[in-house]
């Protein structure tokens, strides 16, 4: 079996307890343990980028990390990945700030990373590249003569052609993506949007079985909805409560708890969510004094104006809601702008009556799946989920809502708060079955297996691809 090489913007080093706590690290480490291999990525440190790679080994897995200098980090990470690709891929062209220097820096860093990885690649290695920071990475490796199998998984949404093609370097990015052998997406709509974007730029040939050719390059596409480890979530949720959390649970025994947690980001729909909760209190006064909504939203990218604006909106809305509806002994909304331990959050999920997950756009949203997995199957809570989260394609037994429609969200919350036990159990059971079937281990195993079934590119096919590249005819 060939060795697996995983490349991501950040890596979870074996000695970093925080980074290895869960999420993507669980799936990647499972794949690496199965095949043996290397995890390559940025150390998270800004410093001397000329230092040798920091390499660590544990069993059959090695980690290799590098530093970025301040200019590269700013142009590649801040200005292009997060100020151009992130907002555009989340349908927020109004927040895109394109600068030619940042685009050049993005390409420069991808080329530099290819140079750093090249000496570590063995002839039979299978490469798996992750997310929007590394869209051109396969193209840079191909330029350096790498013909290994290279797969790519996009964790965030892929926007419609009307959005994607508004990006100045859209054609270059699409052609670079075609240098991957396998491109994986969270949903079928993401996969379709990618192919439609190509078809608007050049001839797209359907080779059958979700395999295509464009710009003389053949590639496969597939949908791989990322999952979680439900057993790990259940273990963490069922454990004993810390004293402060036990006290809080006791205080809430006569109040139904609506709970949400995600980082502070404009894609998560937090201002719209606060307005929907305000509508619930206005239209359904029977819940006054009997419910509490807790929103945890730790700051991310706090130096960016768009994120500062959201924080101000939330603080203003929370004050208004509590001022208008609060009573002595009852605060309807708790807004916490701080980080909490992930294992602790699983316990909070378990005693929350409603999980409110309403992003405006999200590739998958694992919080929705974690909430379901954390529930007591004999007395589960209800998930209220945005139709624009990738998870809505799988968790169809949730209460699916349009996050832009505050009345619809408020009505769903009212329904969730009064849902009979039998219906709650049936909905939870159906969602948990899906989560177990498409867990994080199945996700990585499917992707790696599909990638390894693709024949590696030969030098001849690479040259043919160059010869076959023609401009699109008008």
UniProtKB/Swiss-Prot annotation:
<dbReference type="InterPro" id="IPR012766">
    <property type="entry name" value="Trehalose_OtsA"/>
</dbReference>
<comment type="similarity">
    <text>Belongs to the glycosyltransferase 20 family.</text>
</comment>
<protein>
    <recommendedName>
        <fullName>Trehalose-6-phosphate synthase</fullName>
        <ecNumber>2.4.1.15</ecNumber>
    </recommendedName>
</protein>
<feature type="binding site">
    <location>
        <position position="301"/>
    </location>
    <ligand>
        <name>D-glucose 6-phosphate</name>
    </ligand>
</feature>
<feature type="binding site">
    <location>
        <position position="263"/>
    </location>
    <ligand>
        <name>UDP-alpha-D-glucose</name>
    </ligand>
</feature>
<keyword id="KW-0328">Glycosyltransferase</keyword>
<feature type="binding site">
    <location>
        <position position="268"/>
    </location>
    <ligand>
        <name>UDP-alpha-D-glucose</name>
    </ligand>
</feature>
<comment type="pathway">
    <text>Glycan biosynthesis; trehalose biosynthesis.</text>
</comment>
<feature type="binding site">
    <location>
        <begin position="366"/>
        <end position="370"/>
    </location>
    <ligand>
        <name>UDP-alpha-D-glucose</name>
    </ligand>
</feature>
<feature type="binding site">
    <location>
        <begin position="22"/>
        <end position="23"/>
    </location>
    <ligand>
        <name>UDP-alpha-D-glucose</name>
    </ligand>
</feature>
<feature type="binding site">
    <location>
        <position position="131"/>
    </location>
    <ligand>
        <name>D-glucose 6-phosphate</name>
    </ligand>
</feature>
<dbReference type="GO" id="GO:0005992">
    <property type="term" value="P:trehalose biosynthetic process"/>
</dbReference>
<feature type="binding site">
    <location>
        <position position="340"/>
    </location>
    <ligand>
        <name>UDP-alpha-D-glucose</name>
    </ligand>
</feature>
<comment type="subunit">
    <text>Homotetramer.</text>
</comment>
<feature type="binding site">
    <location>
        <position position="10"/>
    </location>
    <ligand>
        <name>D-glucose 6-phosphate</name>
    </ligand>
</feature>
<dbReference type="InterPro" id="IPR001830">
    <property type="entry name" value="Glyco_trans_20"/>
</dbReference>
<feature type="site" description="Involved in alpha anomer selectivity">
    <location>
        <position position="156"/>
    </location>
</feature>
<dbReference type="Pfam" id="PF00982">
    <property type="entry name" value="Glyco_transf_20"/>
</dbReference>
<feature type="binding site">
    <location>
        <position position="77"/>
    </location>
    <ligand>
        <name>D-glucose 6-phosphate</name>
    </ligand>
</feature>
<keyword id="KW-0808">Transferase</keyword>
<comment type="function">
    <text>Probably involved in the osmoprotection via the biosynthesis of trehalose. Catalyzes the transfer of glucose from UDP-alpha-D-glucose (UDP-Glc) to D-glucose 6-phosphate (Glc-6-P) to form trehalose-6-phosphate. Acts with retention of the anomeric configuration of the UDP-sugar donor.</text>
</comment>
<dbReference type="GO" id="GO:0003825">
    <property type="term" value="F:alpha,alpha-trehalose-phosphate synthase (UDP-forming) activity"/>
</dbReference>
<feature type="site" description="Involved in alpha anomer selectivity">
    <location>
        <position position="86"/>
    </location>
</feature>
């Amino acid at each position: 079996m060939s060795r697996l090489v995983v490349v991501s913007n950040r890596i979870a080093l074996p000695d970093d307890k925080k980074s290895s706590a869960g999420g993507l690290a669980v799936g990647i480490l499972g794949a690496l343990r199965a095949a043996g291999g290397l995890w390559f990525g940025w150390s998270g440190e800004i410093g001397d980028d000329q230092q040798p790679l920091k390499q660590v080994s544990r069993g059959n897995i090695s980690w290799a990390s590098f530093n970025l200098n301040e200019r590269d980090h700013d142009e590649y990470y801040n200005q292009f990945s997060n100020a151009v690709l992130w907002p555009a891929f989340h349908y927020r062209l109004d927040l895109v700030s394109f600068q030619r220097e940042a685009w050049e820096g993005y390409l420069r860093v991808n080329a530099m990373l290819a140079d750093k990885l090249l000496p570590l690649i063995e002839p039979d290695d299978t490469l798996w590249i992750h997310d929007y920071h590394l869209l051109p990475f396969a193209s840079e490796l191909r330029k350096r003569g790498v013909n290994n199998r290279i797969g790519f998984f996009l964790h965030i949404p892929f926007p419609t052609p009307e959005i994607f093609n508004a990006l100045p370097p859209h054609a270059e990015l699409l052609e670079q993506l075609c240098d991957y052998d396998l491109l994986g997406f969270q949903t079928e709509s993401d996969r379709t949007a990618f192919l439609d974007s190509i078809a608007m730029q050049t001839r797209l040939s359907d080779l059958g079985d979700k395999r295509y050719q464009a710009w003389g390059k053949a590639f496969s596409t597939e949908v791989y909805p990322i999952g979680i480890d439900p057993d790990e979530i259940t273990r963490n949720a069922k454990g004993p409560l810390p004293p402060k959390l036990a006290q809080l649970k006791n205080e809430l025994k006569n109040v139904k708890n609506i709970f949400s947690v995600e980082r502070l980001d404009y894609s998560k729909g937090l201002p719209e969510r606060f307005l929907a909760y305000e509508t619930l209190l206005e239209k359904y006064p029977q819940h006054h004094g009997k419910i509490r909504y807790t929103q945890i939203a730790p700051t991310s990218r706090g130096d960016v104006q768009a994120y500062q604006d959201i924080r101000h909106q939330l603080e203003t809305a929370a004050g208004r809601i509590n001022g208008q509806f609060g009573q002595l002994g009852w605060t309807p909304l708790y807004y916490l702008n701080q980080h909490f331990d992930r294992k602790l959050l699983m316990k909070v999920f378990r005693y929350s009556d409603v999980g409110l997950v309403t992003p405006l756009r999200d590739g998958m949203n694992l919080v929705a799946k974690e909430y379901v997995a954390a529930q007591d199957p004999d007395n589960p809570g209800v998930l209220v989920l945005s139709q624009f989260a990738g998870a809505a394609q799988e968790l169809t037994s949730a209460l699916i809502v349009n996050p832009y429609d505050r009345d619809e969200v408020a009505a769903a919350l009212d329904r969730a708060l009064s849902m009979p036990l039998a219906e709650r159990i049936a909905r939870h059971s159906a969602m948990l079955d899906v989560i177990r079937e498409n867990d994080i281990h199945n996700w990585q195993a499917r992707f790696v297996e599909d990638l390894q079934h693709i024949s590696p590119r030969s030098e001849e096919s690479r040259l043919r691809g160059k010869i076959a590249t023609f401009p699109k005819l008008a």
